[in-house]
C-alpha cells in the first residue's frame, strides 16, 4: 500500500473511532441521571457504611417464657432461691406474686394461692423453716385454701430444718413426690391444684439437693425453675 493511501486509511480509522467514542459518551450521558458528581461519590462511599438490617428482637412473653402460652391458658413460672442474693420468685400471668421487688419473699417455703376460675390472687405467705415453729401454721394455711385453687410453692435458703410431718402430709396430699425428700437447703419448686386435676403433661415439681462437690454457690445448690401453661376450664 502506498504511503498516501496508508495515511488516508489511518485518518479515516481515527475519525471513525472518535465518532464512536463521542456517540457512546452521548448515550451514557443520556442514561445517567443528572446528579452532581459529589452526590455520586458520596453514594458510592456510603454503600459500605449503611447499617446491616437486623432481625427484630423477639417479643417478650408472659413471665419471660420463650414462647407464648396458647389462648385460654394461664402462664406461670416458679424459681427457687439460689445462694444469699438470688431470691425465689413466683410469676403468674405476668404478675410477680412473690419476689424481691414485691418485698414478700423470705427464708423458708414461700406460697402463693390463686383462684383458678378467676385467675385472681387469694393469698401470698412465707414460712420460715429454719427458726421458729412455723410448720403447723403452714399446714393449716395449706389445708384452709379453698377448692378450685392453684398453689405455687418455692423455697428460699432452707425449707426443711423445721418442716414437720403434718406439713409434709398436707403438701404430699396435693401431689408432691419430693416433699419428704427435702434436705437442708434443698432447692424446691412445686405447683398444685386443689379440687381439680392438672393435665399430666404439666411439669409440677423439681428438686435440687445441696452437695458440696457440685453446689453452684458456697453452701447452696443452684436455683431451679419450672414454667408452663395451665389450661382454663379444667374440672
From Swiss-Prot:
Signal peptide region: 1-29
GO function terms (MF aspect): carbohydrate binding; cytokine activity
Glycosylation sites: 208
Keywords, alphabetical: Apoptosis, Cytokine, Disulfide bond, Glycoprotein, Lectin, Secreted, Signal
Record's comment on post-translational modification: O-glycosylated.
Bilayer-crossing regions: none
GO biological process: apoptotic process; insulin secretion
Tissue: Expressed at high levels in the pancreas and, to a lesser extent, in small intestine and prostate. Also detected in stomach, testis and fetal liver. In the pancreas, localized in the islets of Langerhans; in the testis, found primarily in the round spermatids; in the CNS, found in the Purkinje cell layer of the cerebellum and in nerve cell bodies of numerous brainstem nuclei.
InterPro entries, A to Z: FAM3, ILEI/PANDER_dom
GO cellular component, one term: nuclear envelope lumen
Pfam families found in the cross-reference section: ILEI
Glycoprotein in keyword set: yes
Domain GG-type lectin intervals: 72-233
Transit peptide found in the keyword field: no
Cysteines joined through disulfide linkages: 63-91, 69-229
Subcellular location as annotated: Secreted
Induction per the UniProt record: By glucose.
Further comment found in the protein's record: It is unclear whether the N-terminus residue of the mature protein is Glu-30 or Ser-46.
Family membership: Belongs to the FAM3 family.
Biological role stated in the UniProt entry: Induces apoptosis of alpha and beta cells in a dose- and time-dependent manner.
Listed name of the protein: Protein FAM3B
Organism: Mus musculus
